[in-house]
Curated annotation (Swiss-Prot):
Primary residence: virion
Disulfide feature: none
Gene: S3
Listed name of the protein: Major inner capsid protein VP3
Superkingdom as given in the UniProt entry: Viruses
Coiled coil: none
Subcellular location, record wording: Virion
GO cellular component, one term: viral inner capsid
Chain positions covered by the region annotation Disordered: 60-96
């Protein structure tokens, strides 16, 4: 079609116009054909209502009918089969198609039989084949040995660490030692863990234990030996190491972690491939639940200092994509108004996907919503557990058995077992900030001579983890368990105890040491077979605590202790036999207490019935209990897919409000003894891990590909915007191809293929990273606004100088919540800027103090640190990192600089997005004077009408992302009604305090046209933005 055709043009024919006249007079002047009109949906929607056009349409379609009928059948076959042959021979053009295009021709119902008949002039329909991809699931061994070679006496060379599967070679791996930027980019790529399935566990041996050679404790032994020999032998020997060989010669292992700042114990830091992503997926939600925040604080709270390290581990989008099993299509939305106001996971009460920034005032509601969804999801998962139909052997007559024994077995029923396992599993899956307790109002507890009460109390202490119970519950359970064994003494015995007249107790030596040896052997075995977990330093680690052993928390531990890890990321069905040892331990422990209970009755001269009765119950059908335990575990595994689940924490976390309990999971008092005696049943379906994951029930995976592209691009943008990130926005703009390669590499970790072609993934990533994303300001709703200042903008007749010598103040610590610019009434022509008060001298750290500071740990000077090289351009992030290492309560780093301002005039009232700008920090080795430059800072202004005349004002809705505040210094004029105040360095400016109840005040305009800018611009860089 011609480009000169008017927009919305509809070629309507005349009433008596012929087909030839219509084509020559109406269509040809716009370079249109009749087929073009038929294939245009907008035109046909209007012309189908025109009778004159419909007559011409019928005439056009019947015009060539005889020629089509006379054509031979061979020609017809050639016409139909020709596109198929071309499609098989040359499928490549399909990838280059820009989008899915389906051309549809609107026809009458009478002409429906004509659809399959090809016409000579009709263009071929172009249908772009969408890229179909699927999630990449690799296979990985659960355990790999540590290989090393000992030469030169005790000198050790490590050939394999056993953690190579955790690291993938990124596009920057080869040059990571030559370019510091590539080292940081390689580390960033390795934070995205590849999903993997560990190899299946072997079958247990005849004793019910899985062979120890297949678990991490053997790896720990290698690491311990390696660490000990390495620390003793290699201390003063320096050898050359080939960077590409993978061999490591080291004199003392301090950490095997892949991430800096993590101070981990060596033999506790080994994790199976892909495991970490599942654990860290919950951390973002946990931050909303556990930590208290300081609104608008001058120095960030400890959790905010660690935010940059925590964010790197949080990839809930990918974790959810790997674990999702729902046929519902995922809707990909992209709101241009909140492009950059995104975190990896910003929570609200409705969903876990990307949403606008949550304000601090909403943190409590966010926490409640997240916890409620966690409790609800966990309860729904465990609801499939049902009561057992197992029949118990009960006392048949009351002639031999006492009435209270018969009553005890009458009260021992199956339903409490199912209720107990439902609530216990719900607590373990989603019990964050919830309390686990036992119902102490059961009617059985009201009877003082109940036989079942002490047995049920003992069963609760045997089955449950007492560290999860409150002290009051534990005291009550112990009291009820021991109540039959005291309180029956004589008055004389009580008096003797009160007068300290207690007989001396003589401890006899243990006659048989085999029992002691057995206990020691069991203790050692339990220690060696614990699941590996990382014990990290809270001051330097990315997360305060990562206890893999109890996250997710599991109520039952199978033989070997490593089976839970394979269950969560494994590829075979759960082995019930692995729980036989623990099931047997539960039975033996309960029988020991029952025998002790019967022994007391025998000493009192009473008949004993409990031991024989419980022995018959627990020994009949011995497989029922470990099958029931397996059902509980299988149900929990089935439900662990949901990202809503937040497991309980193991121990106190700094900053956590552990006293704030929002939910209670109350177990029935007889639930534990009922579970040991009856077991449970499962109404849920059989569960085969990864079966549905291999075939995602979606009509097309192309939306998933688009969604992943946006998420990966957002990850890179967030890392660049983070002051503690590994690269900056300037790095991205200068090295665009490298960052697009990085995004593609990360996507290929999760997807088997990406969209190629001219308009494929690479094209879209370039748009997301460098074309379509802009910084948008958010609304100022931060507490503490009364402490801010309002800088008056009196700019009538001001001409901005191009180069200005001034100072830059770089804020060291970010505030908890950003302070942004606000204009609630866009129709007004007056604008104001909020700025913080300039800090005192003792809060300012000079740049020269940073570069000349020598660290107490013996580190080298600034000029010799491994991150800095002569002539390198430093960004703001590096200055902040160096400033944080210097003791003292400093808030800003002062840098003498020269600023270049770029005035930008706004011609209309629409919002304009600020372009990025850079602040280059440069130095020369050996020169004390540091020189820095801030270039091309956009300063937006517009000419507005005020009292009938034009006036130059700043537009503050479009300031850059770093919230650079430009204070324009004016000459003092008492007639304006404002007294000048000193901001810093003798600079005088117009400042007035903003009331906490009012966001904006009416600005007062300078009516003197001769008012000019006297001195320079004071540049305050305050990185409140994203």
């Amino acid at each position: 079609m011609s480009n000169t055709m008017p927009e919305g043009y509809i070629p309507r024919p005349g009433k008596d116009q012929t087909l030839e006249a219509y084509i020559s007079e109406e269509l040809s002047k716009h370079n249109l054909t009749f087929n073009d009109v038929l294939n245009n949906e907008e035109m046909m929607a209007e012309l189908s209502k025109d009778d004159a056009f419909m007559k011409l349409k019928a005439e056009f379609e019947n015009k060539d009918k005889p020629e089509v009928v006379e054509a031979s059948s061979n020609k017809k076959e050639e016409k139909v089969s020709e596109p198929k042959v071309e499609e098989k021979k040359d499928p490549e053009p399909e990838k280059d198609a820009p989008a899915l295009v389906v051309e549809e021709v609107v026809m009458d119902d009478d002409d429906a039989d004509e659809v399959e008949k090809p016409t000579m002039e009709a263009p071929k329909s172009t249908v772009a084949k969408l890229t179909e991809t699927q999630f990449r699931i690799d296979s990985s061994n659960l355990m790999s040995k540590i290989d090393f070679t000992i030469a030169y006496d005790k000198l050790m060379t490590v050939d394999s660490f056993g953690v190579e599967d955790l690291v993938t070679k990124s596009p920057f791996y080869a040059t990571r030692l030559d370019k510091p930027r590539h080292m940081r980019m390689d580390e960033f790529c390795n934070e995205f863990i590849e999903p993997a399935i560990p190899s299946a566990l072997g079958h247990p041996n005849s004793e019910g234990y899985t062979d120890m050679v297949g678990f991490d404790w053997e790896k720990n032994q290698y690491l311990n030996l390696y660490e000990e020999l390495g620390r003793r032998s290699v201390e003063a020997i320096e050898l050359d190491d080939d960077a590409n060989a993978g061999d490591v010669i080291i004199g003392g292992v301090t950490s095997l972690s892949m991430i800096k700042q993590v101070n981990a114990i060596v033999h506790d830091a080994i994790l199976p491939k892909g495991r970490l992503a599942y654990i860290m997926a919950q951390m973002r939600a946990a931050r909303c639940l556990q930590f208290t925040r300081v609104a608008n604080g001058q120095e960030a709270t400890p959790e905010d200092k660690l935010q940059a390290y925590m964010d790197a581990y949080m990839n809930p989008t990918y974790t959810r994509a790997l674990r999702i099993r729902t046929p519902e299509p995922r809707v990909v939305t992209y709101n241009k108004a909140i492009d950059y106001v995104m975190y990896r996971l910003t929570l609200n009460a409705d969903n876990d996907f990307i949403s606008p920034m949550v304000q601090i005032s909403d943190s409590i509601d966010v926490g409640r919503g997240v916890r409620s969804r966690s409790y609800q999801a966990a309860t729904t998962v465990m609801s499939v557990i049902a009561s057992s139909h197992r029949n118990l052997e009960r006392p048949m007559t009351s002639a031999r058995a006492p009435a209270k024994v018969i009553t005890a077995f009458t009260d021992l029923v199956a339903p409490p077992a199912a209720e107990a396992m439902q609530k216990l599993g719900s607590y373990c899956l989603g019990g964050r900030r919830a309390e686990l307790t036992v119902d102490m109002t059961d009617p059985i507890l009201q009877s003082t001579d109940s036989v079942l009460a002490p047995i049920a109390a003992a069963a609760n202490l045997i089955l449950l983890d007492t560290n999860r119970l409150g002290n009051d519950i534990k005291r009550t359970l112990v009291y009820r368990m021991l109540s039959p064994f005291y309180g029956t003494g004589t008055r004389a015995e009580v008096d003797r105890i009160n007068f300290n007249n207690i007989p001396r107790i003589v401890l006899t030596p243990i006659p048989d040491r085999r029992g002691l040896h057995g206990r020691l052997a069991n203790f050692i075995r339990r220690q060696l077979t614990k699941p590996a977990y990382g014990r990290m330093d809270r001051n330097d680690s990315r997360i305060w605590r990562a206890d893999i052993q109890t996250t997710p928390m599991l109520p039952f531990v199978p033989a070997g202790g490593m089976t839970p890890l394979s269950m969560h990321i494994g590829d075979e069905r759960l082995e019930n036999q692995a729980y036989a040892p623990q099931a047997n331990e539960l039975k033996v422990s309960l029988m020991d207490f029952v025998k002790m209970f019967d022994l007391m009755h025998a000493r009192q001269g009473k008949e004993t019935y409990l031991s024989s009765q419980f022995s018959a119950i627990l020994t009949n059908e011995s497989s029922y209990l470990y099958n029931s335990i397996s059902m509980v575990m299988r149900t929990m595994i089935r439900g662990w897919e949901s990202l809503d689940l937040l497991p309980p924490l193991d121990g106190a976390v700094p900053g956590a409000l552990e006293m704030d309990r929002t939910e209670a999971f109350v177990l029935p008092f007889t639930g534990a003894v009922s579970f040991i005696c009856y077991g449970i049943e499962d109404d849920g379906l059989e569960y085969v891990p990864w079966e549905q994951r291999k075939e995602i029930p979606m009509p097309s995976s192309f939306p998933m590909l688009l969604d992943m592209e946006i998420r990966v691009a957002n990850e890179l943008l967030l890392e660049a915007a983070d002051p503690a990130g590994r690269f900056t926005r300037s790095d991205m703009l200068i090295n665009q191809d490298e960052f697009i390669n990085m995004a593609e590499f990360i996507m290929k970790k999760y997807l088997t293929s990406i969209d190629g072609g001219e308009f494929g993934t690479r094209y879209r990533l370039h748009w997301y990273l460098f074309e379509g994303i802009r910084i948008h300001n958010r609304t100022l709703q931060t507490p503490g606004i009364e402490d801010l200042k309002v800088a008056r903008r009196i700019l009538d007749g001001v001409k901005y100088p191009e180069d200005i010598a001034t100072a830059v103040y770089i804020k060291i610590y970010e505030s908890v919540n950003p302070i942004d610019l606000v204009n609630p009434d866009p129709q007004r022509s007056d604008y104001q800027v909020y700025m913080e008060e300039i800090p005192a001298d003792d809060e300012i750290l000079e740049i020269k103090d940073i570069v000349t500071y020598r660290r107490e740990d013996g580190g080298e000077d600034f000029n010799f640190t491994p991150y800095l090289h002569s002539g390198e351009t430093f960004n703001l992030d590096l200055i902040r990192k160096l400033a944080k290492s210097i003791p003292g309560d400093h808030r800003y780093v002062k840098v003498p600089t020269k600023v270049t301002v770029k005035p930008v005039e706004l011609l209309d009232n629409v919002d304009v997005i600020a372009e990025d700008f850079t602040v280059a920090l440069k130095f020369k080795k050996g020169v004390n004077e540091m020189r820095f430059e801030a270039s091309d800072i956009p300063l937006y202004y517009r000419w507005d009408k005020f009292n009938g005349r034009s006036q130059l004002t700043l537009d503050v809705r479009v300031f850059p992302d770093t919230n650079v505040l430009l204070d324009h210094v004016m000459e003092s004029d008492p007639r304006m009604g404002y007294a000048p105040q000193v901001l810093n360095d003798g600079t005088v400016g117009w400042v007035s305090t903003l009331s906490g109840n009012v966001y904006l005040e009416e600005r007062k305009v300078c009516r003197r046209e001769e008012e000019v800018l006297k001195s320079g611009i004071d540049l305050l860089i305050d990185p409140y933005g994203v």
